[in-house]
C-alpha cells in the first residue's frame, strides 16, 4: 500500500480559490459594473435625442440633417466619457482593494 501525504480533504491542485470572504468586495464591483452599464446605455441615447430636438433644432436652429450629425458627435463623446470614468473608477477600486489586502 502506498503512503500518501496527509492533505486537507478539499485541497485539489488547480482548484478555484475560496472567495466567500470577499462578498462585500464582489457586491461593490457588481454595483459599479451595473451602474456604468446602465449609464452607458441611457446617457448616449438620451443625450442624442434630447440634444437633437432641444439644443440643435429648437435653440440653435440647425436643420434636421445638421442636427443628426452634431447630436451623434455628442453621443459618441458621451460614450467616451463614460468609458473613461469606468476605467478610472475600476482602477482606483482595484488599487484600494489591493492595498487593503496587502496590509493584512
Swiss-Prot record:
Gene Ontology BP annotations? vacuolar proton-transporting V-type ATPase complex assembly
**InterPro entries from the entry?**
Vma21
Question: Out of the domains of life, which is the source?
Answer: Eukaryota
Instruction: Please provide an example of a Pfam family that matches this protein in its UniProt record.
Output: VMA21
Major localization class: endoplasmic reticulum
Topological domains annotated Lumenal: 50-68
What's the protein's topology in the membrane? Multi-pass membrane protein
- Cytoplasmic topology: which positions? 1-28, 90-104
Segments for region (Disordered): 1-21
Keywords for this protein: Cytoplasmic vesicle, Endoplasmic reticulum, Membrane, Transmembrane, Transmembrane helix
Keyword presence, Transmembrane: yes
Entry's transmembrane regions: 29-49, 69-89
One GO cellular component term of this record is: endoplasmic reticulum membrane
PANTHER family under this entry?
VACUOLAR ATPASE ASSEMBLY INTEGRAL MEMBRANE PROTEIN VMA21
Family per record: Belongs to the VMA21 family.
> Which function does this protein serve?
Required for the assembly of the V0 complex of the vacuolar ATPase (V-ATPase) in the endoplasmic reticulum.
- The protein in question is named Vacuolar ATPase assembly integral membrane protein vma21
Source lineage: Eukaryota, Metazoa, Chordata, Craniata, Vertebrata
From the UniProt record, report the name of the gene that encodes this protein: vma21
Amino acid at each position: 500500500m502506498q503512503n500518501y501525504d496527509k492533505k486537507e480533504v478539499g485541497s485539489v491542485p488547480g482548484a478555484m480559490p475560496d472567495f466567500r470572504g470577499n462578498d462585500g468586495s464582489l457586491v461593490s464591483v457588481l454595483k459599479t459594473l451595473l451602474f456604468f452599464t446602465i449609464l452607458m446605455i441611457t446617457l448616449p441615447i438620451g443625450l442624442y435625442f434630447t440634444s437633437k430636438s432641444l439644443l440643435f433644432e429648437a435653440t440653435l436652429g440647425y436643420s434636421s440633417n445638421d442636427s443628426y450629425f452634431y447630436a451623434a458627435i455628442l453621443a459618441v463623446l458621451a460614450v467616451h466619457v463614460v468609458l473613461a470614468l469606468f476605467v478610472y473608477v475600476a482602477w482606483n477600486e482595484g488599487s484600494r482593494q489591493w492595498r487593503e489586502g496587502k496590509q493584512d
